[in-house]
Amino acid sequence: MKSVRYLIGLFAFIACYYLLPISTRLLWQPDETRYAEISREMLASGDWIVPHLLGLRYFEKPIAGYWINSIGQWLFGANNFGVRAGVIFATLLTAALVTWFTLRLWRDKRLALLATVIYLSLFIVYAIGTYAVLDPFIAFWLVAGMCSFWLAMQAQTWKGKSAGFLLLGITCGMGVMTKGFLALAVPVLSVLPWVATQKRWKDLFIYGWLAVISCVLTVLPWGLAIAQREPDFWHYFFWIEHIQRFALDDAQHRAPFWYYVPVIIAGSLPWLGLLPGALYTGWKNRKHSATVYLLSWTIMPLLFFSVAKGKLPTYILSCFASLAMLMAHYALLAAKNNPLALRINGWINIAFGVTGIIATFVVSPWGPMNTPVWQTFESYKVFCAWSIFSLWAFFGWYTLTNVEKTWSFAALCPLGLALLVGFSIPDRVMEGKHPQFFVEMTQESLQPSRYILTDSVGVAAGLAWSLQRDDIIMYRQTGELKYGLNYPDAKGRFVSGDEFANWLNQHRQEGIITLVLSVDRDEDINSLAIPPADAIDRQERLVLIQYRPK
């Protein structure tokens, strides 16, 4: 009976965090709008081989993540939940692997359930796992690889070992097809410390080639298909998206070596109090094979991405699966022997909630700031933000009431965030980061436009997805579409600032021409170097400028 209650509680937890509130949040640009539009175009065109964005070749990532996103929109429609359905599914599958692997390592159902709840409630997992990017997919394949390698090395027969390594190769192959060759580097680096300490080199060398073969066979069909269709894909993807992005001096998203330290700290909420103890206990018990394995899968990817020049918080998502298992194991030990870490965790959550309440007041219309984040007419959003942090502090306090029994309620600290964050985003943020909001405000003007031009790829993708059209033209800036715009068949999809006046004269009689520009908050739009317009509609950071036929 207790198991049934636990299952009902877990399903209610998943529904409140990962299902019910998702549609209340508008899509963020540039990431969510980009991936939403790529998948929409894939469904509309029926081309499941070559990814396109705004009708242009888009080679920044392979295809598998787009497949899953497309299936999400196919099943649930072109809406906010449909766009995010794929990442939510991947996150829940990863949680299922956490459950299974914890159960296999320790044979403890309670520990397995706690590891799952900790994983799903970690701030970084929830933030990325409900956000339409490709990282939850690669995290799933990496965690699946972690489980597969363990299965292979623990098997007692050659058939079991062979099956495990073949499965490992499939997960690596799908990882390559999701986000590239990092799906090969991370598993290799993560298993080497364990193989070395356990002296399991013989099994690795005897059976490892099976993983290589199954990985190649997994990638080969699509790899050959896209090489035939687009011969320069692999050259661009390998040299530009891997070498330049991560290793060279001009790598994207450059950050210092210590970049991931604050990411780990913030991402571990509401379980931050368990982080030092989980890592220390894991190191202290390094003679235990399973502990070393989990510790290696936590630390090695973190070191790898710290050394790389290009960094983003999403890159280390897979580390938190093994970390959640270590945290759950340590938490049960602490609850039984010395609950000091659990008390510290409760106080950290109280402090975080109270700090958030104070910070919300400071940036509210009633605070001391001359330019508040929320305006007076957005009072309900301020109260939503206060509710988010109040619930966080409340559940932090509740875990202290009987810490040996109530510590696990820290999983409910982000409940207010999950339910209310979509209602608390300030209008000034929505107007710049949520193209859906802009489209809703300007729908009547946008809909009849013959041509739409914009200077932001993220906004362009949002307009294309909302209006169900892929012919948005880039104006002045090419951004990440630069490579696709270089193809001969992309001629006419970019208009420079100097060419715009002539282009306008040539196309004006064909219908309404709409220009959507991103501007600074205090920028005078009358100073823009564009021909006089027939209509201007400014929505804070985005401006709609229209030219009608003459």
From Swiss-Prot:
> Superkingdom, according to UniProt?
Bacteria
UniProt KW Transmembrane helix keyword: yes
This enzyme's EC code(s): 2.4.2.43
Q: Name one GO biological process term.
A: protein O-linked glycosylation
Q: Which reaction does it catalyse?
A: 4-amino-4-deoxy-alpha-L-arabinopyranosyl di-trans,octa-cis-undecaprenyl phosphate + lipid IVA = lipid IIA + di-trans,octa-cis-undecaprenyl phosphate
Question: Pathway of this protein?
Answer: Lipopolysaccharide metabolism; 4-amino-4-deoxy-beta-L-arabinose-lipid A biosynthesis
Main subcellular localisation: membrane
Give the enzyme class: transferase
Which UniProt keyword terms apply here?
Cell inner membrane, Cell membrane, Glycosyltransferase, Lipid A biosynthesis, Lipid biosynthesis, Lipid metabolism, Lipopolysaccharide biosynthesis, Membrane, Transferase, Transmembrane, Transmembrane helix
Subcellular compartments: Cell inner membrane
Ranges annotated as spanning the membrane: 7-27, 81-101, 111-133, 137-154, 165-185, 204-224, 255-275, 288-308, 315-335, 346-366, 382-402, 406-426
Extract the GO molecular function terms from the UniProt entry.
Answer: 4-amino-4-deoxy-L-arabinose transferase activity; mannosyltransferase activity
Q: Which GO terms describe its cellular component?
A: plasma membrane
Q: How does it sit in the membrane?
A: Multi-pass membrane protein
Give the protein family: Belongs to the glycosyltransferase 83 family.
What this protein is reported to do is described as: Catalyzes the transfer of the L-Ara4N moiety of the glycolipid undecaprenyl phosphate-alpha-L-Ara4N to lipid A. The modified arabinose is attached to lipid A and is required for resistance to polymyxin and cationic antimicrobial peptides.
Protein name per Swiss-Prot or TrEMBL: Undecaprenyl phosphate-alpha-4-amino-4-deoxy-L-arabinose arabinosyl transferase
Q: Which organism is it from?
A: Shigella boydii serotype 18 (strain CDC 3083-94 / BS512)
Ranked from the top, the taxonomy reads: Bacteria, Pseudomonadati, Pseudomonadota, Gammaproteobacteria, Enterobacterales
Gene symbol of the encoding locus: arnT
